[in-house]
Curated annotation (Swiss-Prot):
Residues 456-644 form the Laminin G-like domain. Belongs to the multiplexin collagen family. The lineage of its organism: Eukaryota, Metazoa, Chordata, Craniata, Vertebrata. Residues 1425-1442 are annotated as: Triple-helical region 10 (COL10). Probably plays a major role in determining the retinal structure as well as in the closure of the neural tube. Residues 1313-1324 are annotated as: Nonhelical region 8 (NC8). It comes from the Eukaryota. This is Collagen alpha-1(XVIII) chain. It is linked to Knobloch syndrome 1: A developmental disorder primarily characterized by typical eye abnormalities, including high myopia, cataracts, dislocated lens, vitreoretinal degeneration, and retinal detachment, with occipital skull defects, which can range from occipital encephalocele to occult cutis aplasia. Glaucoma, primary closed-angle: An autosomal dominant form of primary glaucoma, an ocular disease characterized by a marked increase of intraocular pressure causing damage to eye structures and function. GLCC is characterized by elevated intraocular pressure due to iridocorneal angle closure with retention of the aqueous humor in the anterior chamber. Iridocorneal angle changes are apparent in the fourth to fifth decade of life, and patients manifest age-related variation in the severity of glaucomatous damage.
């Protein structure tokens, strides 16, 4: 409704009246209702007697007594006594008779009232300008609302507006907030404020001002963040208006506004201007209901408001926004709510205002008006229907005005749209046009927050659109669109996206399902956030004896497990389409089967509702982790409705309505989900467009508010009944439903298949008009009258005509007219002109679907008007829900249909049709047409310009003598006076204080030598290692302080110091008494010499002081060399100290075992050498002063005799393989030798035998050039016996012929553990042509250096004749070498050891191995095969293209050329000493062990991590993983052998060739090299650490187990690794398989022994580690040395016996809170199960244990 053009005049008048009413200066009853009883008005608002000062009202209190209390309320002024007709329901008490001359008195008093108003305005404005600060309003702009339940409070202006509030709607069951004090009598003193002003919201206010929103309609959503916008209403009493007992004790309380979460409110106030400062009054609903707030929106009404604001102050400007209905001081009464209206009492309304917004002035009129709403209120067709009803008939109020505003016209239209099918004639009992519009201002409408409130949630919303991939969509011939759920279906969502945090108290669940199996299954479930129990759900049991149960799962808050609230047993319906519905209302639950009530059972539940956590889950066809049973079958419909009533139209398929193709708000039903019908959901909350003028009778097939048409459904000889009509008081209409056709037996008659949609039929004839309605309805509109567009009462609701008497009692509602008979279907013809749109008619009974009609003929009609905006559709969030627990979450990983934000506002609708001009209005307050008296005096004008200065006035009389003045300030200093006479000599003064000591004098001449000084502190020890063996005079510093030795003889006197600079002369000091002997001071640094001073007197010599303690400072001057002191040996590892006292060096103790070097060949025992001659004494060393300067030569002590030889140390670990050197120069060619005879093969069955001494070298053959090296898998073999040479391979392809090189003589076997013969054979080029046999040549000259320089022999010569077959050797581990290109295929060998591998291609011919010596050694060996005949010698080939290794000096150089390196080649960067391997599309770094110093005798070995080699044989499909022997030296010297004893290794299968030099690589799948490989036949369990430390928050034991599994797989470990942790459900001891606990050793990643068995670890001694034990991570890092683990502690959560400690495992390893603790052990203490509770925020080592030894998987 557009504002009236002439409303400004009355607005100005009301503005003045409002200000006066604010100051209690004026009674405005005459303005609003000229027929009001003045006796009531006199007690309500006292009239002023002249201008009265405005008094603050904060000190006036109103004692409000609970309604059931016995104490009468002590009512303050402004709180009238309620009339008797409302105190007792059902008894009509006659109202006070009005005096017949009341109108005349009213007219006569207008002039006096106006004069009083004018005077009051002047006083009030002046007082307001002087007392109200501008910033007081700004502080009152922020709204703080109480949630979830709180009273509706109005904050009125007082001396402290922020501290004042009057409770309007008291809440029930809320604890008293601070500041609310209850007396012994049960009353609560509360301040009585004045009515609220514009800027003061109707709730307690705190904080700074909020900038106003820019839209015309505002809500709290713009201010209060993104909390879920939900307002939940309690269902009204099922009996409607039946009398109810008084509400329980209620107290008016001040709301607690602290620590609350504000809500977005669904009901807001309309606003006119562009700038609206939102404010709200909140409703505290009883019980556990959520809050529904009505938000008042103030606005800027135009320039005149700002003008008044500038004139009278901000408070008055704010008051101007509420003009229109003048909510602050209307004439009326605030009365207690009668018990006959429990529907409003449930909303928290305890008092209401009369007259209401329908101008009812008595309780009887209110009850009569409420009868027309009785049936509609029971339908719950709109979520805010009860609010609309109560705001209209019983507007809530406090003890003082104003009442709550009326609902807006748009609110009314939204109700009419949602409830049209439940209305008789499609109309509400009130005309929406009679209510103010949103643009008019002071009214309540539905805000944006209500658009997300869903009264019904359907299947497609719960599944998402599109549904998850595991849920398939089908088109069933019986029901249409349906969804198939299999065993893998997953459809979890967050419940709070569809339901409020406080779930519906009463509700219904509707299903249309067809089970596919006889097993149990959950149809629907809402779980807690942990998915531990089902809060609400429906479950089908398994079929037993032809029956199955349907259970309602309803778990009360605080319960520990899922509770079955009710269970119904019915015949099994597997494979049958069945309608099921559960209705939960109050204390009962009812089951409906195929639309008939099957059984009703009591439901025991508390008054508390279901609180849904933020992470609560919502599932369809399952219950997530709370229940493993999943429903398997087809679901066509699933609805969760807030309405507990289950009607046939909800239960049955709406087959006749093709436009209703969806179930729920967003649809999941049988038609197009995009078309939504809102007739049942009540969710079409957006206001519709203004409807055209109604016709007399609605058509039979009308249009929905969101659909263009409904299909025609006509059944012959059937009367169309009103859908959902209820029997209203005083009417005879019968409640009927038109759901489906029923047979005489009462069963539902199933219809046939759906046909196609027919064309709309011809509208039937209009029905007969009904009898006239209530006389209270407004008449036709009149001409615009001077009325404000702001207010809800008075002319804004209904135009008040001229003088008329008070309205009589309302008549009874007329019975609705009968619906017209349905017309016969007309023949299809050309469509006629479009007629006026009629009201939607009631749907007829469901009839059979007709055939689709022919399309109409004719031109296309004009487009219809734009429809209202549709309901919000589901939005889809593409991010997946993340849940903490890794043990399995029922939430789906698919796109989830989560409700999205509100869309943009739609385009403005078309302008309405202008109304007819009304009759000229009359002045509404006089009884005649004569003009009224003069108006009020105007507001004071602006300040005029200053006048001319006046003439000076006459002098005034002399004033009285003033009070004495204050004492003056001190004057300034005067000038200096004349000098005085000389005084007499004074008495001698007292002795002065003793002066400070003078500066130190200059050093005197050198005195005689003094006695020897006291012994100094012990000097530092000597280091464990000496650079020169003869000793040095310089200082030595040890790594640890030695023990104090015996006192040595006194040292020589020190050198003479330099003379100092002369110091200033000082006064002679008095000789002091001898002081107490002090401790020797620390030597200080030499200071700057002062000037020479006078010589002081020599003091007496003090006594010798005690020896001082060790000081901290610069070292003193060293003394002269003394006799030889003790030589101290300090261990570099553990800091232990060994010393040998005595002047001369005696033979020392046995030294610590040195690091293990590589095991060499067995040499002959050498004789003990004699000690070398003693060297000459060196030059004396220098002596240094504290500042670093050299003072003089020092003397060197004599060297002691060499000590005895210590015992032999333990065997060291084998050394690392050396780097591959470059090929040496080819030797001089020799003569080809004669072919030797074939040797006899060795007998492999004899076991391992000793090999004989090597024979003389054979004649050299023609050497070939070295080719590309290949990988040698047996570089470090563990066996002590060499094997015979392998089988010769097939002849390789010929290579390019090279120049003939010189042949060098073969050198003796070297000491370096490398197979040079094999390497050379692998580096050969392609075989050349066969040469002629030559004579034996002379011995060639020695070669000029081998691979590693001239100190080593050159490479072996060409292969000689094969020798006799030796005994087979033990296969050694894989060694570090160069991975070459695959050679040509060799012949298939016999099966190897272990599981059969796949057959590989034949290898290249292998040369015989170099001679070896008997006994243990580290020479490379091969698994021998029977010797074959040697191939014919070829001509020398050219030099190979490459050795398979590329060297670069820097990493930058490597990055520039690495793309040129073939895949599989090794790359060495000299600058960083790093090794890389070229892989597909990049390169990978090879992890190396720590550097090992070269042992004596070798100078070319370097540590290298042995990369894995996977050998594939044609007959073995499983890869064989070789076991690298440990090659690192021990990290500390101890008595542990570097090579721990290994378990016995079985010998290989007889005759199995070991393809040690051939590697089959898979070029298509380059993988990262595993850090470990292990033999199949060795039973061990590995204990390995994760690659990075973890805090106590590991996402549970399953999260840690998963990381162990994942990282073990990444390095090629196929066993099952579990975290070395105790948890809530497992002890650490029980992780390893029972069969492997007693005898299987525990080793690290390098197979170094850690514990002899799993049980030995839990012997109660906290798992002591052996000295030198190492623990590696999966990527090969030593956790005790690597900086990745700064804290060397291990999580375990166990006691020493491996049992879990429930108080110390970081809350099942799920938290990293500093306050939580977990049991850990420090590895620095040498124990794996040490008992130390540490904070869970620390990042410690997490170990993984292989829980069983599985040979086949390793």
């Amino acid at each position: 409704m557009a504002p009236y053009p002439c409303g400004c005049h009355i607005l100005l008048l009301l503005f003045c009246c409002l200000a006066a009413a604010r100051a209690n200066l004026l009674n405005l009853n005459w303005l609003w209702f000229n027929n009001e009883d003045t006796s009531h008005a006199a007690t309500t608002i006292p009239e002023p007697q002249g201008p009265l000062p405005v008094q603050p009202t904060a000190d006036t209190t109103t004692h409000v007594t609970p309604r059931n209390g016995s104490t009468e309320p002590a009512t303050a002024p402004g709180s009238p006594e309620p009339p008797s007709e409302l105190l007792e329901d059902g008894q009509d008490t006659p109202t006070s008779a009005e005096s017949p001359d009341a109108p005349e008195e009213n007219i006569a008093g207008v002039g006096a009232e106006i004069l009083n108003v004018a005077k009051g305005i002047r006083s009030f404005v002046q007082l307001w300008n002087d007392t109200v600060p501008t910033e007081s309003l700004a502080r009152a702009e922020t709204l703080v609302l109480e949630t979830p339940v709180g009273p509706l409070a109005l904050a009125g202006p007082s001396s402290t507006p922020q501290e004042n509030g009057t409770t309007l709607w008291p809440s029930r069951g809320i604890p008293s907030s601070p500041g609310a004090h209850t007396t012994e009598a049960g009353t609560l003193p509360a301040p009585t404020p004045s009515p609220p002003s514009l800027g003061r919201p109707w709730a307690p206010l705190t904080g700074p001002s909020v900038p106003p929103p820019s839209s015309g309609r505002a809500s709290l959503s713009s201010l209060l963040g993104g909390a879920p916008p939900w307002g939940s209403l309690q269902d009204p009493d099922s009996q409607g208006l039946s009398p109810a007992a008084a509400a329980p004790s209620q107290q008016l309380q001040r709301p607690d506004v602290r620590l609350r979460t504000p809500l977005l409110h669904p009901l807001v106030m309309g606003s006119l201007g562009k700038h609206a400062a939102p404010s709200a009054f909140s409703s505290g609903l009883p019980g556990a209901l959520s809050q529904v707030a009505v938000t008042t929106l103030t606005r800027d009404s135009g320039a005149w408001v700002s003008h008044v604001a500038n004139s009278v102050g901000p408070g008055l400007a704010n008051n101007s926004a509420l003009l229109g209905a003048d909510p602050e001081a209307p004439a009326g009464r605030c009365l207690p709510l009668p018990p006959s209206l429990p529907v409003c009492g449930h909303l928290g309304i305890s008092r209401f205002w009369l007259p209401n917004h329908l101008h009812h002035e008595s309780g009887e009129q209110v009850r009569a008006g409420a009868r027309a709403w009785g049936g509609l209120l029971q339908t719950h067709c709109h979520p805010f229907l009860a609010w609309f009803f109560c705001l209209l008939l019983v507007p809530p109020c406090g003890s003082v005005p104003p009442p709550a505003p009326p609902p807006c016209c748009q609110f009314c239209e939204a109700l009419q749209d949602a409830c049209w099918s439940r209305l008789g004639g499609g109309r509400l009992p009130v005309a929406c046009a009679s209510l103010p519009t949103q643009e008019d201002g002071y009214c309540v409408l539905i805000g944006p927050a209500a658009e997300r409130i869903s009264e019904e949630v359907g299947l497609l919303q719960l599944l998402g659109d599109p549904p998850p991939q595991q849920v398939t969509q089908t088109d069933d011939p019986d029901v249409g669109l349906a969804y198939v759920f299999g065993p893998d279906a997953n459809s979890g969502q967050v419940a709070r996206y569809h339901f409020p945090s406080l779930f519906f108290r009463d509700f219904s669940l509707l299903f249309h399902i067809r089970p596919a199996t006889e097993g149990p299954g959950v149809l629907f479930a809402i779980t807690d956030s942990a998915q531990a129990m089902v809060l609400l759900g429906v479950k089908l049991s398994g079929v037993q004896d032809g029956h199955q149960d349907i259970s309602l799962l309803y778990t009360e808050p605080g319960a520990g497990q899922t509770h079955t609230a009710a269970s119904f047993r019915l015949p099994a319906f597997v494979g049958q389409w069945t309608h099921l519905a559960l209705s939960v209302a109050g204390g009962f639950v009812a089951l409906y089967v195929d639309c008939e009530e099957f059984q009703r059972m009591p439901l025991a539940r508390s008054s508390r509702g279901l609180e849904l956590e933020p992470g609560a889950g919502l599932f369809v066809a399952q219950a997530g982790g709370a229940d493993p049973d999943k429903f398997q079958g087809v679901i066509a419909e699933l609805k969760v409705r807030r309405d507990p009533q289950v009607s046939p139209m909800h239960c049955l398929d709406e087959e006749g309505d093709d436009s209703d193709g969806a179930s729920g708000d967003s649809g999941s039903g049988l038609g197009d989900a995009r078309e939504l019908l809102r007739e049942e959901t009540g969710a079409a909350l957006k206001p519709r467009l203004p409807a055209p003028p109604p016709v007399t009778t609605p058509p039979l097939a009308g249009g929905s508010s969101t659909e263009d048409s409904r299909s025609e459904e006509v059944e012959e000889q059937t009367t169309v009944a009103s859908l959902g009509a209820q029997t209203l008081p005083g009417s005879d209409s019968v409640s009927t439903w038109d759901g489906s056709v029923r047979t005489p037996g009462g069963r539902v008659k199933e219809g046939g298949l759906k046909g196609q949609k027919g064309e709309p039929g011809v509208p039937g004839p209009p029905g007969r008009a009904g009898p006239p309605g209530s006389p209270c309805l407004p008449g036709p509109p009149g001409l615009p009258c001077p009325v404000s567009p702001l207010g809800p009462a008075g002319p804004a609701l209904q135009t008040v005509p001229g003088p008329q008497g008070p309205p009589g009692p309302p008549g009874r509602d007329g019975t609705p007219g009968r619906d017209g008979e349905p017309g016969d279907p007309g023949e299809d013809g050309k469509p006629g002109d479009t007629g006026p749109q009629g009201f939607p008619g009631t749907p007829g009974d469901v009839g059979p679907k007709g055939d689709k009609g022919d399309p109409g003929v004719g031109e296309r009609g004009p487009p219809g008007p734009q429809g209202p905006p549709g309901p919000p559709g589901p939005s889809f969030r593409h991010d997946k829900l993340t849940f903490i627990d890794m043990e399995g979450s029922g939430f789906g990983g698919d796109l989830e249909a989560l409700r999205g934000p509100r869309g943009f506002p739609g385009p403005p609708g078309p302008p309405g049709v202008p109304g007819l001009p009304g009759e000229p209005g009359r002045f509404g307050v006089n009884s005649s047409d004569v003009p009224g008296p003069a108006g009020l005096p105007g507001v004071p004008g602006r300040e005029g310009p200053p006048g001319f200065p006046g003439l000076p006035g006459p002098p005034g009389p002399p004033g009285r003598e003033g009070p004495p003045g204050r004492t003056g300030q001190k004057g300034s200093l005067g000038e200096a006076g004349a000098p005085g006479h000389k005084g007499s000599k004074g008495a001698p003064g007292p002795a002065g204080a003793r002066g400070e000591s003078g500066l130190a004098g200059a050093p005197g001449p050198a005195g005689p030598p003094g006695p020897p000084g006291p012994p100094g502190p012990p000097g530092p020890g000597l280091p464990a290692g000496f650079d020169d063996m003869e000793g040095s005079g310089g200082p030595f510093w040890s790594t640890a302080r030695s023990a104090d030795g015996p006192q040595g003889p006194p040292g020589l006197p020190g050198l003479k110091g330099d003379p100092g600079v002369p110091g200033l002369p000082g006064a002679k000091g008095e000789v002091g008494a001898d002081g107490v002997p002090g401790f020797p001071g620390l030597p200080g640094r030499e200071g700057i010499a002062g000037p020479q001073g006078p010589k002081g007197d020599r003091g007496s010599r003090g006594e010798k002081g005690d020896p001082g303690k060790d000081g901290v400072g610069q070292p003193g001057l060293p003394g002269p060399p003394g006799p030889p002191g003790p030589v101290v040996y300090v261990s570099e590892q553990d800091g232990s100290v060994l010393s040998v006292p005595g002047p001369e060096g005696r033979p020392g103790f046995a030294g610590f075992p040195g690091p293990a070097g590589p095991k060499g060949n067995l040499g002959s025992k050498g004789e003990r050498g004699s000690p070398g001659p003693k060297g000459e004494k060196g030059e004396p060393g220098s002596i240094f002063s504290p500042d670093g300067g050299a003072l003089g030569p020092a003397q060197k002590g004599a060297k002691g005799e060499p000590g005895f030889r210590g015992p032999p140390g333990p065997y060291g670990r084998p050394g690392y393989k050396g780097e591959i050197g470059f090929p040496g120069r080819p030797g001089r060619p020799g003569m080809n030798g004669l072919k030797g005879e074939k040797g006899e093969p060795g007998d492999a069955s004899l076991g391992f035998g000793m090999r004989g001494m090597p024979g003389p070298p054979g004649p050299p053959g023609p050497p070939g050039p070295p080719g590309t090296p290949v990988y040698d898998s047996n570089v470090f073999a563990e066996s002590s016996r060499p094997g015979p040479p392998g089988l010769p391979g097939n002849q390789g392809p010929p290579g390019p012929k090279g120049a003939k090189g010189e042949v060098g003589p073969p050198g003796p076997p070297g000491q370096f553990p490398f197979d040079f013969l094999q390497l050379e054979a692998e580096m050969k080029g392609e075989k050349g042509d066969r040469g002629d046999a030559g004579q034996k040549g002379e011995r060639g000259e020695p070669g000029g250096g081998g691979f590693f320089g001239s100190s080593l022999p050159g490479p072996p010569g060409p292969p000689g004749p094969p020798g006799p077959r030796g005994y087979p050797g033990i296969p050694g581990p894989k060694g570090e070498s160069i991975r070459g290109q695959p050679g040509p295929p060799g012949p298939q060998g016999p099966p190897g050891i272990g599981y059969e591998g796949r057959q590989g291609p034949p290898g290249p011919p292998g040369p015989p191995g170099p001679p070896s010596f008997p006994g243990p050694h580290r020479q490379t060996i091969s698994v021998p095969g029977p010797p074959g005949p040697p191939g014919p010698p070829g001509p020398p080939g050219t030099m190979g293209a490459s050795s398979g290794v590329r060297l670069w000096a820097t990493r930058q150089a490597m990055l520039g050329q690495v793309h040129e390196v073939p895949e599989g080649w090794l790359i060495f960067v000299a600058e960083q000493e790093e090794l890389y391997v070229r892989v597909q599309n990049g390169f990978r770094k090879v992890q190396l062990e720590a550097r090992t110093p070269l042992p004596r005798g070798t100078d070319n070995e370097v540590a290298a991590l042995q990369p894995p080699v996977v050998q594939l044989h044609d007959s073995n499909p499983y890869p064989r993983r070789e076991h690298p022997h440990p090659t690192a030296r021990p990290w500390r010297a101890d008595d542990i052998l570097a090579s721990p004893p290994r378990l016995p290794e079985p010998q290989p299968y007889p005759g199995a060739p070991h393809h040690s030099s051939y590697v089959h690589l898979r070029p298509a799948r380059p993988t990262s090299p595993p850090a470990h490989s292990h033999r199949d036949f060795q039973p061990v369990l590995h204990l390995v650490a994760l690659n990075s430390p973890l805090s106590g928050g590991m996402r549970g034991i399953r999260g840690a187990d998963f990381q162990c599994f994942q990282q073990a797989r990444a390095v090629g470990l196929a066993g099952t690794f579990r975290a070395f942790l105790s948890s809530r459900l497992q002890d650490l001891y029980s992780i390893v398989r029972r069969a492997d606990r007693a005898a299987v050793p525990i080793v690290n990643l390098k197979d170094e022994l850690l514990f002899p068995s799993w049980e030995a670890l839990f012997s109660g001694s906290e798992g002591p580690l052996k000295p030198g034990a190492r623990i590696f991570s999966f990527d090969g890092k030593d956790v005790l040395r690597h900086p990745t683990w700064p804290q060397k502690s291990v999580w375990h959560g166990s006691d020493p016996n491996g049992r879990r400690l429930t108080e110390s495992y970081c809350e099942t390893w799920r938290t990293e809170a500093p306050s939580a603790t977990g049991q850990a052990s420090s590895l620095l203490g040498g124990r794996l199960l040490g008992q130390s509770a540490a904070s869970c925020h620390h990042a410690y080592i997490v170990l993984c244990i292989e829980n069983s030894f599985m040979t086949a998987s390793k």
